[in-house]
Curated annotation (Swiss-Prot):
Highest taxon, organism lineage: Archaea
Entry function: Catalyzes the condensation of carbamoyl phosphate and aspartate to form carbamoyl aspartate and inorganic phosphate, the committed step in the de novo pyrimidine nucleotide biosynthesis pathway.
Single GO BP term: 'de novo' UMP biosynthetic process
Pathway in which this enzyme or protein is active: Pyrimidine metabolism; UMP biosynthesis via de novo pathway; (S)-dihydroorotate from bicarbonate: step 2/3
Residues the record lists as binding carbamoyl phosphate: R61, T62, R111, H139, Q142, L274, P275
Protein name, entry field: Aspartate carbamoyltransferase catalytic subunit
Keywords, comma-separated and alphabetical: Pyrimidine biosynthesis, Transferase
Length: 315
């Protein structure tokens, strides 16, 4: 469902489905919700709506921020947090589960381990489908809140030098963020990873097609001093087909305060989609470098804006 530049009734499958104007509209609405939430806890634009949260994979921040966003807007939520909790465990197909949810709810927020699951669901459902992460490449709403965070921190997304660090092969948040940057005009993108975890060919193809300046490197120290934004990701253990491969790359990078003080610009800001394991040392948390908790907080106003725009409700 839903196409064109307008938001009403639109599916959210890939960040590449959106242009700059659509994203700027989203960010302006998110700014309004950010201000309104400081004044009052509830803005009942979606009173009477039901939002289905269909999480076939575990999630903390994404699921809870969508649930909070829906409830702050006055909507009710239904859903589940794993396949084991529903009839999929008894052999029900994804298609039948989507049809059931579509008959109950006004929107479906879907997370699934298989790539293409959100697009498949959108083809079946009459109501809008929002991809909350599927497979290894797409996590569009995470990319939206990541861009929004950069915009709030720097006043712009253009003209900055970005480093994306860690699991660029299996990490869908990293892939989506890299793809999202191609909608803007970054000065430079450094893709920092071990050889086993280099960015996927289809992501590299988009970078090339859109004329992005980027470079693949293994050493963080080599480029850290140039960066305005460092986007750190954990190594995605659960997505490795071979655990021996995981053991080769686990702990490849660790961002410490000492490393930052030696190499980073004072203006550098660090993002992380969370959860983290040990890739950012806890002593970084209390420094101006750390923007990842603010980034997580931005999930609620951005997802409120998303739900309201798709419902066609004005702030």
């Amino acid at each position: 469902m839903g196409s064109g530049s307008g938001w009403k009734g639109r599916d959210v499958i890939s960040i590449l489905d959106f242009d700059r104007d659509s994203l700027e509209q989203l960010f302006e609405v998110a700014d309004k919700f950010s201000s309104l939430l400081r004044e009052r806890g509830r803005i009942p634009l979606l009173e009477g709506y039901i939002v289905a949260l269909a999480f076939f994979e575990p999630s903390t921040r994404t699921r809870l921020s969508f649930e909070t966003a829906a409830k702050r807007l006055g909507a009710d939520t239904i859903g589940f947090t794993s396949e084991e909790a529903i009839s999929i465990a008894k052999g029900e197909t994804l298609a039948d589960t989507i049809r059931m949810l579509d008959s109950y709810a006004d929107m479906i927020v879907l997370r699934h381990r298989y790539e293409g699951a959100a697009l498949y669901a959108a083809e079946i459902a009459e109501h809008p489908v929002i991809n909350a992460g599927d497979g290894k490449q797409h996590h569009p709403t995470q990319a939206m809140l990541d861009l929004y965070t950069v915009r709030k921190l720097f006043g712009t997304i253009d003209g900055l030098t970005y480093g994306v660090l860690g699991d660029l092969r299996y990490g869908r948040a990293a892939s989506s963020f890299i793809l999202a940057l191609t909608i803007y005009r970054p000065r430079m993108i450094y893709l920092i990873s071990p050889p086993l975890l280099r960015v996927r060919p289809e992501v590299r193809m988009v970078l090339d097609e859109r004329g992005m300046r980027y470079r693949e490197v293994e050493s963080l120290e080599e480029v850290l001093g140039e960066l305005d934004v460092l986007y750190v990701t954990r190594i995605q253990r659960e997505r490795f087909p071979d655990q021996r491969e995981y053991e080769k790359v686990r702990g490849s990078y660790r961002v410490t305060l000492e490393l930052l003080e030696q190499h980073a610009r004072r203006e550098l800001r660090i993002l992380h989609p969370l959860p983290r394991v040990d890739e950012i040392a806890p002593e970084v948390d209390g420094t101006p470098y750390a923007a990842y908790f603010e980034q997580a907080r931005n999930g609620v106003p951005v997802r409120m804006a998303l739900l309201a725009l798709i419902a066609g409700r004005e702030v």
